Regions:
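Flexible, compositionally biased loop and terminal segments
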Residues: 1-140
Length: 140
């Protein structure tokens, strides 16, 4: 379990609960469940740029070493692979400020169902649709 987003606006009790949950599952193998709370990708990117700038000013990193991999390490999802699939409920064809950097080569499946009504059969359908895709990772 990984909570992504600006946690500073939550109560200390809730922040501590998030930390406890992340700690209790950090050594597990397999998939990571990202729970986005107070998350906005533009904010995430601005925060990453500020933190990189601070580390450049302090001499921790050299400007010449800034690349996509280093930048990714400053995001909330540092250390995780980019998502293969994002399921977009509600039938909306928009990204809604969600994982703008990480979703560069992600496949999207748009489901015409609201999130509260989403069922296992919908997940199965989305995975089936995804499994039939020919992923090109930006290629033609």
């Amino acid at each position: 379990v990984k909570f992504i987003g600006d946690k500073s606006h939550f109560s200390l009790d809730l922040q501590n609960l998030m930390i406890e949950n992340e700690e209790s599952s950090k050594d597990r193998d397999g998939m990571v469940l990202n729970i986005a709370m107070n998350y906005g990708s533009r904010d995430e990117i601005v925060r990453a740029v500020k933190n990189i700038s601070t580390d450049v000013k302090s001499g921790k990193i050299d400007v010449e070493n800034i690349d996509e991999a280093l930048f990714s390490n400053y995001l909330y999802t540092a250390g995780q692979p980019d998502p293969d699939l994002i399921i977009r409920p509600s039938g909306e064809y928009r990204i809604s400020n969600f994982m703008l950097w990480q979703a560069a080569y992600t496949e999207f499946v748009i489901m015409n169902k609201l999130w509260p009504d989403f069922e296992k059969s919908d997940l199965d359908e989305a995975i089936n649709i995804y499994s039939q895709r020919n992923r090109r990772f930006g290629g033609v």
